């Protein structure tokens, strides 16, 4: 059987409340699904998690040389410090929707003051030079410093996986864009007044009452 996808188009003739007819079109593609495979960043994360020497690198003052076997790897920019909320951070990954497929880069060049939207636009493919990279975990988030980022010309659409609360709470999708559906604030937060000058947090639950942590 052919591995090439087959495409068909269905046409529906419908009637509105005034009796007027109109058409709706539905395109259906049939073919062999090829699941995503672990990419270069995913393999890097696997190396970090499997390296017992790096387990003690907690906090920037305990950063350790990465000493990865690959001097350069390819990645996609997932997010930058456009609004100053990701202070000096650049989020990069394989952009395949898999768990453990992204990591945070930390450095002064990624700061909002250096116009990261122009220099490091989300969706752009990049090459990461890891020869002098150092690793540490900050608040349980995996980070690299001293990474040289070369931005390419190719831009791709970001893959945003939809997660259950259980999957999100594992922490395996850190540094990635994700989507959670049907989330609502806990009842204790409903109707609560907010002020722009206060730091506040909200507990979110899914439709079954499971809490996002």
Region roles according to the model:
Residues 1-2, 213:
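Accessible peptide chain termini
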Residues 16-25:
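Short, exposed coil/turn segments at beta-strand boundaries within extracellular/luminal domains
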């Amino acid at each position: 059987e052919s591995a090439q996808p087959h495409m068909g188009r269905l046409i529906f003739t419908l009637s509105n409340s005034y009796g007027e007819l109109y058409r709706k079109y539905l395109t259906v593609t049939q073919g062999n699904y090829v699941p995503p495979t672990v990419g270069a960043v995913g393999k890097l994360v696997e190396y970090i998690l499997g390296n017992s020497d790096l387990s003690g690198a907690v906090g920037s003052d305990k950063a350790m040389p990465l000493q990865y076997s690959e001097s350069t790897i390819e990645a996609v920019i997932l997010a930058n410090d456009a609004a100053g909320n990701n202070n000096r951070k650049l989020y990069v990954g394989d952009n395949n929707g898999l768990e453990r497929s992204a990591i945070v880069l930390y450095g002064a060049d990624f700061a909002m003051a250096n116009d990261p939207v122009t220099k490091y636009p989300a969706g752009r493919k990049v090459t990461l030079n890891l020869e002098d990279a150092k690793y540490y975990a900050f608040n349980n988030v995996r980070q690299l410093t001293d990474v040289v980022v070369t931005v390419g010309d190719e831009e791709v659409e970001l893959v945003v996986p939809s997660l259950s609360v259980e999957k999100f709470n594992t922490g395996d999708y850190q540094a990635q864009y994700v989507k959670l559906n049907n989330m609502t604030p806990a009842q204790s937060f409903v109707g609560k007044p907010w002020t722009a000058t206060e730091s506040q947090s909200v507990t979110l639950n899914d439709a079954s009452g499971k809490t996002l942590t």
